[in-house]
Swiss-Prot record:
Homodimer. The gene is pemK. InterPro entries: PemK-like (IPR003477), Plasmid_toxin/cell-grow_inhib (IPR011067). This is Endoribonuclease PemK. Transmembrane segments: none annotated. One of its GO terms (molecular function) is RNA endonuclease activity.
Length: 133
């Protein structure tokens, strides 16, 4: 967030928070190129879900993301996937919680698409917690 002050016609100071185009928040889906990759990593230009909080992303400019795919059969059967179908957003497929990675969104030409519902974000964080702890 970018802070700035404004004076109104009476000379009063007001602070406003303005969201910068590059701000990245937990729960947002961005379209980004994941190439180059190696092995079984998700590749190509695809949606990713940001899982790190905005404060972390502002400081590091390197969010941790998980890819969204229309495939992911292994992740589905192993319980690592969270479905986005029928949750009221345009992006469809499954979130691959088994493939978190840190990316430089700016260098990869990332573009903000939309935000997932809080229930989906909580489910993704729960799956990540199970995998990482």
């Amino acid at each position: 967030m970018l802070k700035y002050q404004l004076k109104n016609e009476n000379g009063w100071m007001h602070r406003r928070l303005v969201r910068r185009k590059s701000d990245m928040e937990r729960g947002e889906i961005w379209l980004v190129s994941l190439d180059p990759t190696a092995g079984h990593e998700q590749q190509g230009t695809r949606p990713v879900l940001i899982v790190t909080p905005a404060a972390f992303n502002r400081v590091t400019r390197l969010p941790v993301v998980v890819p969204v795919t229309s495939g992911g059969n292994f992740a589905r059967t192993a319980g690592f996937a969270v479905s986005l179908d029928g949750v009221g957003i345009r992006t469809t497929g499954v979130v691959r919680c088994d493939q978190p990675r840190t990316i430089d969104m700016k260098a990869r030409g990332g573009k903000r698409l939309e935000r997932v519902p809080e229930t989906i974000m909580n489910e993704v964080l729960g799956r990540l917690s199970t995998i990482l702890t």
